[in-house]
C-alpha cells in the first residue's frame, strides 16, 4: 500500500509534481489545496479570505486533514498539501518537501493566477504567515521544521521536468528498497 506525501511552500510546484508522480505511478492524487479551495468557493470566499476564516475556525483544517488521513490509511495514493506530510507521516512511505525562493514562487503564482508579481508576493507572505500560526495553534506543528521529510528539494532553478524526475528517482529508489520489488 504505497503512500507518497508531497508538501511544500505556496508556488513551489507541489501540485504539479504530485499530479505527475501520481500519473507515472498510476495512483490517484488527493490535493489538500484543492479541497481547501473547494471549501472556500462553497463558503463564497477567495483563498486569502478563507485562510483568515480558517484561522478562527479550526474545523476547516480538521476537515481537510481528516480527508488526507483517511486516504493515507487506505493506501495507494499520492497526497499533496502544505501540511499533508506532517498529518500522514505515520502512513507515508515517502515524504517530499518542495521549496523555492520567495521571488521565484511569486513569479509562478502571478503567472498561474494572472495577478501582478507584487500581489502574488503579498498573498504568499500572508498565506505563509497564516499557515504557520494556524498549524502551530491547531496541531503544535512548526512548519519550518523539515526533519520529518525524506527529501527536501529546492525547485528555484529546476524545470518542472527536472523536479519530477528527481522526485520520481527518489520515490522509486525508496519504494524499491522498502518493498524489495520494482515499483518504477
From Swiss-Prot:
Q: Give the primary localization class.
A: cytoplasm
Gene3D superfamilies named among the record's database cross-references: P-loop containing nucleotide triphosphate hydrolases
Q: Does the keyword Transmembrane helix apply?
A: no
Tell where it localizes: Cytoplasm
Q: Which reaction does it catalyse?
A: CMP + ATP = CDP + ADP; dCMP + ATP = dCDP + ADP
Q: Which enzyme class?
A: transferase
What is one GO cellular-component annotation here? cytoplasm
Name the Gene Ontology molecular function terms of this record: ATP binding; CMP kinase activity; dCMP kinase activity
- Segments spanning the bilayer are none
Q: What is this protein called?
A: Cytidylate kinase
